[in-house]
Design a protein with these regions (language model features):
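Alpha-amylase-like alpha-glycosidases and glucanotransferases acting on alpha-linked glucans and related
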Residues: 1-9, 15-237
Length: 237
């Protein structure tokens, strides 16, 4: 960033940040100090799902254009061909699952394979947090792992940006919907594990005294991790 500020022409691309909003605010503030009337043109590489919009509070001009390309590329695609390709695929493989179920299974596969270590770390952090309160200490580590994996596999977007009042109504709704879907997909898993995740992510109810900093850190790392799971599960698997 210092090189960018000094040269005024070098561009950088950030990916997978724990708190991209804070980074963007600090970047803009750094430009404001020497030249408050000459703010840089900053765009972010952000893939937006259907119905998802860039948070208007972010100090950026927009995205690098994936959302525009999604619309433009549609001009070159015959939608009727999708049905033919789907039928051919089903005849060839015998797999009649829909795309959403394919994505769900692919993301579960990734979390049980190459991204296993990260999931394990998150689960143990969740268990330590749950053990800190008498209302959640009985939730087993198995239930937490199944609830977490099911939630991340059911989340239809790369990540959310909840915490510090940054989250949008869309993000809160999609977290609730994804947790409900994950719970339906795993009827044998303790419901209290899903309720614990919901309380953690949506900050409802607020944390007990002394637990807020730890909760905020776990939420930040969990949200950071879902983007990698989505990228590997949807794009690469």
């Amino acid at each position: 960033e210092k090189l960018t500020l000094h040269s005024k022409w070098i561009t950088t691309l950030v990916d997978g940040l724990l708190n991209p909003v804070e980074y963007l605010e600090r970047l803009q503030a750094a430009f404001d100090d020497p030249a408050p009337n000459h703010r840089p043109w900053v765009v972010v590489e952000k893939v937006l799902a259907r119905g998802e919009h860039l948070n208007p509070l972010w100090p950026v001009a927009g995205t690098t254009g994936y959302d525009a390309l999604d619309v433009l590329n549609g001009l070159f695609i015959n939608r009727r061909g999708a049905r033919l390709l789907r039928r051919f695929f089903q005849r060839l493989t015998g797999d009649c699952r829909g795309f959403r179920e394919e994505v769900y299974e692919s993301k579960r596969q990734i979390m049980e394979g190459s991204l296993r270590s990260g999931v394990t770390i998150l689960v143990h952090e969740l268990k330590r947090l749950a053990d800190a309160s008498w209302t959640t200490r009985d939730i087993s580590i198995y239930a937490l792992e199944e609830a977490l994996s099911g939630f991340m596999a059911s989340l239809p977007i790369y990540r959310t940006y909840l915490g510090d009042g940054q989250g949008t109504a869309f993000e809160r709704d999609i977290v609730s919907d994804s947790l409900e879907l994950a719970a339906r997909r795993a009827p044998s898993v303790d419901r209290s594990a899903f309720a614990f995740l919901r309380s953690l992510l949506l900050d409802d109810p607020p944390p007990e005294e002394g637990l807020a900093p730890r909760r905020a850190q776990i939420v930040a790392r969990l949200q950071q991790y879902t983007s990698g799971v989505h990228a590997k599960g949807v794009e690469d698997t």
